[in-house]
Swiss-Prot record:
Single GO term (MF): 4 iron, 4 sulfur cluster binding
A family per Pfam: Fer4_7
Biological role: NDH-1 shuttles electrons from an unknown electron donor, via FMN and iron-sulfur (Fe-S) centers, to quinones in the respiratory and/or the photosynthetic chain. The immediate electron acceptor for the enzyme in this species is believed to be plastoquinone. Couples the redox reaction to proton translocation, and thus conserves the redox energy in a proton gradient.
Protein's gene: ndhI
Protein name: NAD(P)H-quinone oxidoreductase subunit I
């Protein structure tokens, strides 16, 4: 009889501990259910990158002096600079410039050390292709202006996910109805227009008060 009671007690302890672990796991699950989603419905929703985002490199052929500084500072010597020496002017003449984005690590060293600022990092991050050889961009492809996320009317641009308000370290600390970060340009324009209208209204009201005082003095 005593052995049976000990088995029942052990079984009860194991059941209680299992229920405790189950409640802890479900608690984490329910906590995540109350949080805001951190994903976007790509490609119908796209994030607007930050201003310092290191995307596709933009190249300006007219500014390049073929100094090959970008090649020397590149960790993998990726840029290919094709140039010839002009014997009359004793200067380099650039023929072709290319970067293979299939191997690029987007470190930004070439942009940082370029003496003529002919290279710049853009916000374009959609570089997928069916053929890896098409990722080798020449000076013509590099010279194209980057496409904007907000230019496509069928895509909803989202800017609130990549950023957090000042002083917030964890995105889950924000309430569900609060914006996670920066605002869209249209929202900023509306707020500026509202502020201007309020300033005009305050100025008009301040002008009316002296007029009333003058009328009473008369």
């Amino acid at each position: 009889m005593l052995g049976f009671l000990e088995k029942v007690a052990d079984y009860t302890k194991e059941a209680v501990s299992a229920a405790k672990y189950l409640v802890d796991g479900l608690g984490v699950t329910f906590d995540h259910m109350r949080r805001r989603p951190v994903t976007v419905q790509y490609p119908y929703e796209k994030l607007i990158p930050s201003e310092r985002y290191r995307g596709r490199i933009h190249y300006e052929f007219d500014k390049c002096i073929a100094c090959e500084v970008c090649v020397r500072v590149c960790p993998i010597n990726l840029p290919v600079v094709d140039w010839v020496m002009n014997k009359e002017t004793k200067k380099k003449e650039l023929r072709n410039y290319s970067i293979d984005f299939g191997a690029c690590i987007f470190c930004g060293n070439c942009v940082e050390y370029c003496p003529t600022n002919c290279l710049s990092m853009t916000e374009e991050y959609e570089l997928s292709a069916f053929d890896r050889h098409s990722l080798n961009y020449d000076n013509v492809a590099l010279g194209r202006l980057p496409t904007s996320v907000t230019s496509d009317p069928s895509v909803r641009p989202l800017r609130e996910l990549p950023y957090l308000p000042k002083g917030i370290m964890d995105p889950h600390e924000l309430p569900a109805n609060q914006q996670r970060a920066g605002k869209l340009p249209s929202q900023i324009i509306k707020e500026l227009q509202a502020e201007k209208s309020e300033e005009k209204g305050n100025n008009n009201s301040s002008d009316i008060v002296p007029n009333k005082l003058n009328s009473t003095n008369k």
